[in-house]
Amino acid sequence: MGLYASKLFSNLFGNKEMRILMVGLDGAGKTTVLYKLKLGEVITTIPTIGFNVETVQYKNISFTVWDVGGQDRIRSLWRHYYRNTEGVIFVIDSNDRSRIGEAREVMQRMLNEDELRNAVWLVFANKQDLPEAMSAAEITEKLGLHSIRNRPWFIQSTCATSGEGLYEGLEWLSNNLKNQS
């Protein structure tokens, strides 16, 4: 009841809340993305074993972002975070060509999850500052994003350390949240 009243109150006064699940393979830059958005700075990170959760304010939307560790042995725990997720940010290490197939498999499994059927999908093609980074177009093709027909999706080139592209991604999320409301 409290969550319902909070959402109703927020909607009446123009503020919205959006629950975001941020996932991706280990080392993709999820935690760096989260704290660049939250604090505006790059922090020293260690591999996330559990999760980090922060609220990021953008325009009139309060994004509650759950950054969940990406190591293979803890990915089975991701499903515990699916409930009430309105948006997924899937972070890709654009420089890691050897694991793009693994990222595709992980993403495809998530796309088949019933609890995520109404979530919008934002892919951050991260680490674009590195010289061998795959372009957003190449990642789109390798992930098979064009085959996603049942939900809104978008890919955004990003560099978490500089912040490049991060707010453009939040802009897309905020516009798609409005379309779903």
UniProtKB/Swiss-Prot annotation:
- Gene from which the chain derives: ARF2
Tell me what organism the protein belongs to. Saccharomyces cerevisiae (strain ATCC 204508 / S288c)
Lipid-modified residues, N-myristoyl glycine kind: 2
GO CC aspect terms? cytoplasm; cytosol; Golgi apparatus; plasma membrane
Disulfide connectivity? none
PANTHER family assigned to the protein according to its UniProt record, in alphabetical order: ADP RIBOSYLATION FACTOR-RELATED (PTHR11711)
Cited function:
GTP-binding protein involved in protein trafficking; may modulate vesicle budding and uncoating within the Golgi apparatus.
The record ties this protein, via SUPFAM superfamilies, to: P-loop containing nucleoside triphosphate hydrolases
Superkingdom to which the source organism belongs: Eukaryota
Subcellular localization, per the record? Golgi apparatus
Record-listed GTP binding positions:
25-32, 48, 70, 126-129, 160-161
- Family per similarity comment: Belongs to the small GTPase superfamily. Arf family.
Entry protein name? ADP-ribosylation factor 2
Annotated keywords: ER-Golgi transport, Golgi apparatus, GTP-binding, Isopeptide bond, Lipoprotein, Myristate, Nucleotide-binding, Protein transport, Transport, Ubl conjugation
Q: Which PROSITE patterns match?
A: ARF
Q: Name one GO biological process term.
A: intracellular protein transport
Keyword Nucleus assigned to the entry: answer is no
Q: Give one GO term, molecular function aspect.
A: GTP binding
* InterPro entries the UniProt entry points to: Arf1-5-like, P-loop_NTPase, Small_GTP-bd, Small_GTPase_ARF, Small_GTPase_ARF/SAR
Report residues of the Glycyl lysine isopeptide (Lys-Gly) (interchain with G-Cter in ubiquitin) crosslink: 127
Query: What is this organism's lineage?
Result: Eukaryota, Fungi, Dikarya, Ascomycota, Saccharomycotina
| Alphabetized CDD domains for the sequence | Arf1_5_like (cd04150)
Q: What else is known?
A: Present with 25000 molecules/cell in log phase SD medium.
What Pfam family is a match, any one? Arf
